[in-house]
Amino acid sequence: MMSEIPKSHPRYNSLISRERLVQASKDGLLAESAMIAHGRGEAFDYLLGEKTSASALKSIKEVAKRLKRAKNPVISINGNTAVLAGEDLIKIAATISCPIEINIYYRTPLRVSKLLNLMNKYKQKISKEEVPEKWKAE
């Protein structure tokens, strides 16, 4: 279905994210409640006009500052986060030299293994990319 969604669709990113989660669920990466949790967040995004609010942006910046200043930072992720933001989180973790932990409520050895494999796949992909010119961590 991903290829059928035109990039001009106003909810393109949302629909692509949803499809990625559906596939991840079929692949055994997510808990049964993962789509419910994502849908709840999507509802709020829709109600907020699909824009990052000023307070949310302020919170994002505060988290970045705290991670950067922390003596022993750790990025803790669940299945949805691994699927939707895993690559970006690996880049952040590399920038601030911190580990990423898989922290899932409905934990099974198989799910943990699959999520670790996914994150390792992302890590291998990212390790082959060049650092952008004039890149600077802020």
Please name every model-derived segment.
Residues 93-138:
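Long, charge-dense
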